């Protein structure tokens, strides 16, 4: 790793040196020498890019960035654009995960994918093979609406913990909500409960060092995912752990869109109301979610938990359908994009999507438009206001082609909508951490739950319909009348859609 960092550092210094000599030459020889060196480094980067065999869209995007923004663009390319880096850095973890999960699931009796509706059978047949993750039937889930429902439920379950509490979050802040959860962690640790806390170093930069030390002193085992100590020369910098997982005694689990911060309970006056969806899990499915945590924990701490029987004893309950946990990211071969595509393609009646970041790749857009052409009701809901300028306008750039195909687009007005929900035909759904953008599809560690639980899906549908009442339905005519300034912003932002 150190050798690779030094190689990138010296190559970057050479690029800057060549750039300076070219622009401020002392002699004609230095001018042409600097220019030649500068062009050679850029061409070498473009050659490496072409060898990655990515889509033509992404290849051309990065070529343009490297040519027109060479110094800054080269940094972005080295640490976010290189797909082969992902393959090399996480190859060992990917193989290890596959083997550990195979051994874990081989102990279980896998339910047959039979007796399901056509769309359900098609999706789960694909997802089992593609994701290599078991399905469960002896499980159930409860849909939790917003932070006001979710965090009291999480805190109550944590206080009842007897053996262990395992927590994994992308964003965890030292504010009123974060300290409330930390107090429970420290209290349970002092009582002898094992408490392990994994946080993403980039997402949780507002987790105070003094709070980390307080938790450690209380007995909480806490580690960061991908620390930022090497700055831009950390090749793993751009691969972030976007998962949100809580496991209590192997009996109860929580997963969904909510991080830990006061904005997630609508207490940030700048953001205002926060709309999100989370799930409470019970039964065998908790073991699968726990396995994802244990593999992530082992990766950053070197403590092996997944082989210990006490952490791998499923607690079955009476189920209400088919359930599957799917983790994606640099450590997994499959992409959430593939699973979303299969869900959309399986639809026969309706597709309802709620996502905060809508920057779909070509395959997702094609599937949505094809479904609408077949007469499937397609609804896409996004927030009116976004916390990212580029993402907001890049999302809007896709609306004209969707509206033209008869797809209904809703702009959520009440506040910021952060949920990641998809409902197919009213009998197949997904809730989790993955957005519909390139970061979730290519770079982030994500986890979603796919299920057929009729009661949970009815709840999601009711919530979606309530959200529609708080949304503006975009009309093709009205949207096409937007001003030149908005069109320009959308076109500019779309240039970066491949890296958002």
UniProtKB/Swiss-Prot annotation:
Residues 237-264, 413-440 form the PLD phosphodiesterase domain. Pfam families: PLDc_2 (PF13091), PLDc_N (PF13396). GO terms for cellular component: plasma membrane. The chain crosses the membrane at residues 6-26, 31-51, 59-79. The gene is ywiE. The keyword Signal does not apply. Induction: By heat shock. It is found in: Cell membrane. Belongs to the phospholipase D family. Cardiolipin synthase subfamily. One of its GO terms (biological process) is cardiolipin biosynthetic process. This is Probable cardiolipin synthase YwiE. Keywords: Cell membrane, Lipid biosynthesis, Lipid metabolism, Membrane, Phospholipid biosynthesis, Phospholipid metabolism, Repeat, Transferase, Transmembrane, Transmembrane helix. It catalyses: 2 a 1,2-diacyl-sn-glycero-3-phospho-(1'-sn-glycerol) = a cardiolipin + glycerol. Its EC number is 2.7.8.-. Catalyzes the reversible phosphatidyl group transfer from one phosphatidylglycerol molecule to another to form cardiolipin (CL) (diphosphatidylglycerol) and glycerol. May have a role in the heat shock response since the level of the transcript of ywiE increases after a heat shock. GO terms for molecular function: cardiolipin synthase activity.
């Amino acid at each position: 790793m150190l050798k690779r960092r030094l190689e990138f550092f010296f190559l970057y210094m050479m690029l800057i040196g060549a750039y300076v000599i070219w622009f401020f030459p002392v002699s004609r020889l230095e001018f042409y020498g600097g220019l030649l060196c500068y062009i050679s480094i850029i061409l070498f980067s473009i050659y490496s890019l072409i060898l990655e065999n990515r889509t033509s869209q992404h290849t051309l995007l990065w070529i343009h960035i490297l040519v027109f923004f060479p110094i800054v663009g080269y940094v972005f390319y080295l640490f976010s654009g290189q797909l082969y880096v992902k393959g090399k850095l996480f190859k060992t973890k990917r193989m290890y995960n596959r083997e550990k999960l195979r051994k874990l699931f081989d102990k279980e009796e896998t339910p047959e994918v039979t007796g399901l509706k056509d769309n359900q059978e098609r999706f789960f047949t694909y997802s089992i093979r593609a994701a290599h993750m078991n399905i469960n039937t002896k499980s159930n889930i409860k849909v939790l609406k917003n932070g006001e429902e979710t965090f009291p439920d999480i805190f109550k379950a944590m206080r009842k913990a007897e053996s262990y509490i395992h927590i994994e979050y992308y964003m965890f802040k030292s504010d009123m909500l974060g300290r409330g959860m930390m107090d429970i962690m420290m209290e349970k640790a002092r009582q002898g409960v094992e408490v392990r806390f994994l946080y993403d170093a980039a997402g949780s930069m507002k987790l105070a060092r003094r709070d980390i030390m307080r938790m450690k002193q209380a007995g909480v085992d806490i580690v960061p995912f991908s620390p930022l100590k090497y700055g831009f020369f950390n090749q793993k910098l751009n691969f972030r752990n976007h998962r949100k997982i809580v496991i209590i005694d192997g009996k109860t689990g929580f997963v969904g869109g909510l991080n830990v911060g006061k904005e997630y309970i609508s207490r940030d006056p700048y953001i205002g109301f926060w709309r999100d969806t989370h799930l409470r899990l019970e039964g065998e499915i908790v073991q699968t979610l726990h396995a994802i945590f244990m593999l992530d924990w082992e990766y950053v701490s070197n403590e092996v938990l997944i082989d210990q029987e006490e952490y791998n004893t499923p607690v079955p309950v009476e189920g209400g359908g088919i359930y599957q946990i799917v983790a994606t990211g640099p450590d997994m071969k499959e992409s959430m994009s593939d699973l979303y595509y299969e869900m959309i393609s399986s639809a026969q009646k309706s597709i309802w999507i709620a996502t905060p970041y809508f920057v779909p790749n070509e395959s997702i857009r094609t599937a949505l438009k094809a479904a609408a052409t077949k007469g499937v009701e397609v609804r896409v809901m996004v927030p009116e206001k976004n916390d990212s300028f580029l993402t907001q306008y890049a999302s809007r750039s896709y609306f004209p082609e969707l509206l033209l195909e008869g797809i209904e687009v809703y702009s959520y007005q009440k506040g910021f909508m952060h949920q990641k929900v998809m409902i197919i035909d009213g009998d197949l759904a997904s809730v989790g951490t993955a957005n519909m953008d390139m970061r979730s599809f290519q770079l982030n560690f994500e986890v979603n739950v796919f299920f057929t639980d009729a009661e949970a899906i009815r709840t999601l549908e009711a919530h979606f319909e309530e959200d529609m009442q708080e949304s503006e339905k975009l009309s093709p005519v009205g949207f096409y009348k937007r001003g030149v300034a908005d069109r320009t912003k959308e076109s500019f932002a779309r240039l970066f859609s491949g890296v958002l």
